[in-house]
């Protein structure tokens, strides 16, 4: 019987554990968490409290584990990768539930504390030095980011500053949006979106097929929309309250009081303008509509 460790007991981790416990094939599921979770009492799941900064504690928790699925990023994931490789884990799924890996920048300037690049580099190193294989599940943006409560309503993203409503593109609770509509070449910016529930189902289905057959990356998407369409659909869902466009220049000199910090938005604009030195006016949505 395959022993699967899911690192992270809430949000996506809980969805994965609950669906694996109900899968047609039998798996021994162990949830690694920083604290106890009584909500697992009704599931055929073992909860193990771990300290991700304690090498000996992690090593003990990973004994006999075949597959590790991590649902959080940062330095603690790096510790988990090291311990998994050193303790004979065969397969590792990092917390890289976002865009396709071949289209990501080498360093995430918007979320530098995620250590995403470092995690992939470490996994490549352990692939050479051990028998551990790894696979990324690329799903684009979680649709639940656009809930009124953001990803936090799903207990996702609290440790990586992604939980709050409005942490990406738009905030449906305040009827505001900030997004670059076209890139430096004038092409429409589009995003792939997938519900976190569908991501969990996809991962479980892949486990049923067998990790031994997994490639380096498995991709999925629930939809692919331009950022204008994302804003438009959210506007229609908000009882018809519109989010109207406001054109802003690449260099910000001020910001509306309801917007995100200008430094963060400027970073996003600079990243999109990086391939060229041309000055292009980007269409940014940043408005407040009356309810």
Q: What are these regions, as identified by a protein language model?
A:
Residues 2-28, 32-35, 40, 102-240:
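Oxidoreductase cofactor-interface core, primarily capturing Rossmann-like NAD(P)-dependent enzymes
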Residues 5-6, 69-70, 91-94, 135:
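Structural recognition of the beta-strand scaffold that forms the well-ordered cores
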Residues 53-59, 142-145, 251-257:
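A short acidic, often aromatic-flanked loop/helix-cap motif at beta-alpha or helix-coil junctions
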Residues 30, 46-48, 135, 243-249:
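General small-molecule cofactor/ligand-binding pocket signal
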Residues 217-218, 227-290:
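Terminal hydrophobic/aromatic helix or amphipathic segment near a protein terminus
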Residues 88-89, 162:
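Active-site loop of short-chain dehydrogenase/reductase
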């Amino acid at each position: 019987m395959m022993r699967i460790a899911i690192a992270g007991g809430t949000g996506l981790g809980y969805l994965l554990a609950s669906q694996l416990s109900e899968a047609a094939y039998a798996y021994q599921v162990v949830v690694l968490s920083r604290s106890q979770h009584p909500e697992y009492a009704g599931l055929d799941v073992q909860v193990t409290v771990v300290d991700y900064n304690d090498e000996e504690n992690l090593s003990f928790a990973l004994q006999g584990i075949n597959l590790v699925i991590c649902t959080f990023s940062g330095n603690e994931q790096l510790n988990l990768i090291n311990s998994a490789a050193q303790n004979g884990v065969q397969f590792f799924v990092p917390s890289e539930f976002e865009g396709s890996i071949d289209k990501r920048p080498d360093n995430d300037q918007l979320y530098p504390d995620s250590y995403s690049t470092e995690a992939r580099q470490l996994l490549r190193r352990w692939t050479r030095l051990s028998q551990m294989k790894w696979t990324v599940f690329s799903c684009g943006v979680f649709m639940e980011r656009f809930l009124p409560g953001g990803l936090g309503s799903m207990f996702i993203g609290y440790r990586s500053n992604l939980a709050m409503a409005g942490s990406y593109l738009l905030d449906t609770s305040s009827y505001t949006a900030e997004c670059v509509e076209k890139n430096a070449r004038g092409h429409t910016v589009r995003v792939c979106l997938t519900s976190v529930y569908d991501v969990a189902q996809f991962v479980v289905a892949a486990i049923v097929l067998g990790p031994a057959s997994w490639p380096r990356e498995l991709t999925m998407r629930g939809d692919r929309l331009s950022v204008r369409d994302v804003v438009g659909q959210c506007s229609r869902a908000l009882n018809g309250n519109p989010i109207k466009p406001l054109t802003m220049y690449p260099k910000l000199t001020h910001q509306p009081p309801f917007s995100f910090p200008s430094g963060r938005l400027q970073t996003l604009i600079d990243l999109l303008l990086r391939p060229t030195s041309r000055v292009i006016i980007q269409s940014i949505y940043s408005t407040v509509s009356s309810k």
